[in-house]
UniProtKB/Swiss-Prot annotation:
This is CTP synthase. CTP binds at S13, D146, I147, E148, K186, T187, K188, P189, T190, Q191, K222. Keywords: ATP-binding, Glutamine amidotransferase, Ligase, Magnesium, Metal-binding, Nucleotide-binding, Pyrimidine biosynthesis. CTPSs have evolved a hybrid strategy for distinguishing between UTP and CTP. The overlapping regions of the product feedback inhibitory and substrate sites recognize a common feature in both compounds, the triphosphate moiety. To differentiate isosteric substrate and product pyrimidine rings, an additional pocket far from the expected kinase/ligase catalytic site, specifically recognizes the cytosine and ribose portions of the product inhibitor. NCBIfam families: PRK05380.1, PyrG.
């Protein structure tokens, strides 16, 4: 029997419902329960796949190829469960599926309404996503009081009626602000938020109160009195430097035990020793390395959320504080590579569109020519190949057909644009990896023996997640290999380039997939760990050169 924990948010958005849900999931998992998490998004887009990163932040790709909310990345980083397309759905998806059923005649000519048809579809999707787990944590996106969230709130209200309070539990996350002018903590916003929730039939069982500092006992008692929540169930969650402290903070306040008590679950004590080790390693670094992330969405750091977390994870596993310098690739186009001179390593992440591309190419060239560790992910690998083709293979104006459809040397292109020497356009059968459509999800990669990639992974075959349309052009790759480009990873059928490196460079690696999606704080990821180690080595080498005595003779 699956128990359901519904997490809602009030007062303001961006309080950290995703992190709180994931942290509670980590606690319950440490208590011996199998856990899954779902995110319900109230926007009408079917999924975030076509949304601007500035609007939505990162699109997280699941193993089964779904484009989902970035909160699913938090879920996978905190718990051991692997998320699927069933773990995230939107209002748009719900309505699309209901309309499809109506067109098919499933409702036998009935009038389709929000209640019961939309709410029934929401409940069915929640049950489907929760199937097989002891506990399903269901995060409802948006803020209580928003009109967009009402169908989701009505659906979970109905689930409490249908399943009872031994199988369902409501947690409400609110803001308790500190008003500096008055010198007081204000509980009124939380009181009103709970009042709004109760007005639609939901009484929270537990409150998690977000604040700058820990709530004094008097304020917790006041909140309990006016919200009809027992005082032990009013949890204080103050700001912390690292999100990986939160499972420990919530465990120490008894949240996991409180949940198990209310849901009548017999569970063991939560063993969070691995989280303690993560936090201790993050708080006590022995080294510092500066990494430039050269991208086009750098004004919103959530656009690269999994990437920044993967770098932090690598720092945890190398006892290193990783300082991330986000650099707009258009700024490099305007001001040159001077912006890169103070960094120890350069990373160019994925992206779409031509804006800022030449700046990324300049960054790859700067790293290659100056022996600076370079990590190119997805588009970052493709622009490294473009730069190499132009400079080392004398392919003038080489490019991707995404940016220049008329380029004489399409080193990156849709598979349907590849043309063999005989003038025949490459054709793919149904079921093949199609370059003309988005290639999504986990796919196997075979690594070259004696390559850096093979040494980093420690195995000859890996599965990594993809999100791209364009591929490296096999018809031109042979010329690049003659000039020193190493193809260190290929698809299992040998037709698609998955990884590249340079043999004559200290650390220059590109991958077509997104390794950041599978990095976790407890395990890290071999490519990111190798990258940070290379950055540290480059930093030490630079210091040694600067410290060496001058060779010039003086009178």
């Amino acid at each position: 029997m699956t128990r359901y924990i519904f997490i809602t948010g009030g007062v303001v958005s961006s309080l950290g419902k995703g992190i709180t849900s994931a942290s509670l999931g980590a606690i319950l998992e440490a208590q011996g329960l199998t856990v899954t998490l779902l995110k319900l998004d109230p926007y009408i887009n079917v999924d975030p796949g076509t949304m601007s990163p500035f609007q939505h932040g990162e699109v997280f790709v699941t193993e089964d190829g779904a484009e989902t909310d970035l909160d699913l990345g938090h879920y996978e980083r905190f718990v051991n469960a692997t998320m699927t397309r069933k773990n995230n759905f939107t209002t748009g998806r719900v309505y699309a599926d209901v309309i499809r059923k109506e067109r098919r005649g499933d409702y036998l000519g009935g009038t389709i309404q929000v209640i019961p048809h939309i709410t029934d579809e929401i409940k069915a999707k929640i049950r489907e996503g929760a199937d097989g787990a002891d506990v399903a944590l269901v995060e409802v996106g948006g803020t209580v009081g928003d009109i967009e969230s009402l169908p989701f709130l009505e659906a979970i209200r109905q689930m409490r009626i249908e399943l009872g309070d031994q199988q369902t539990l409501f947690i409400h996350l609110t803001l308790v602000p500190y008003v500096a002018v008055a010198g007081e903590i204000k509980t009124k916003p939380t009181q009103h938020s709970v009042k709004e929730l109760r007005s639609i039939g939901i009484q929270p069982d537990i409150l998690v109160c977000r604040s700058e500092q820990s709530l004094p006992d008097a304020e917790r008692a006041k909140i309990a009195l006016f919200t009809n929540v027992p005082e032990p169930s009013v949890i204080s969650l103050s700001d912390v430097k690292s999100i990986y402290e939160i499972p420990l903070i919530l465990r120490d306040q008894g949240l996991g035990n409180r949940v198990c008590e209310k849901l009548n679950i017999k569970a063991t004590a939560a063993d969070l020793d691995d989280w303690k080790k993560v936090v201790q390693a993050q708080k006590n670094p022995r080294h510092t390395v500066t990494v430039a992330v050269v991208g086009k969405y750098v004004d919103l750091e959530d656009s690269y959320k999994s990437l920044s977390e993967a770098l932090i994870h690598a720092g945890i596993h190398t006892q290193t504080r990783v300082v991330i310098e986000y650099i707009d690739s258009e700024a490099i186009e305007l001001h040159g590579t001077e912006l890169l001179k103070k960094v120890d390593a350069i990373l160019v992440p994925g992206g779409f569109g031509s804006r800022g591309i030449e700046g990324k190419i300049l960054a790859a060239q700067y790293a290659r020519e100056n022996g600076i560790p370079y990590f190119g992910i997805c588009l970052g690998m493709q622009i490294a190949i473009i730069e190499f083709a132009r400079d080392k293979a004398q392919m003038e104006n080489a490019n991707s057909t995404e940016f220049d459809p008329k380029t004489p040397f399409p080193v990156v292109a849709l598979v349907s644009e590849w043309m063999a020497k005989e003038g025949i356009i490459e054709k793919r059968k149904w079921g093949d990896d199609l370059g003309g459509t988005m290639r999504l999800g986990g796919q196997p990669c075979r690594l070259k023996i004696d390559s850096l990639a093979r040494r980093l992974y420690g195995e000859d075959r890996v599965i990594e997640r993809h999100r791209h349309r364009y591929e490296v052009n096999n018809d031109l790759i042979g010329e690049l290999e003659k000039k020193g480009l190493v193809i260190s990873g290929r698809s299992i059928d040998d037709r698609l380039v998955e990884m590249i490196e340079l043999a004559d460079h200290p650390w220059f690696v590109g991958c077509q997939f997104h390794p950041e999606f599978t990095s976790t704080p407890r395990k890290g990821h071999p490519l990111f760990i190798g990258f940070i180690k290379a950055g540290l080595a480059a930093k030490e080498a630079k210091k040694a050169v600067l410290a060496a005595p001058s060779q010039e003779k003086t009178d």
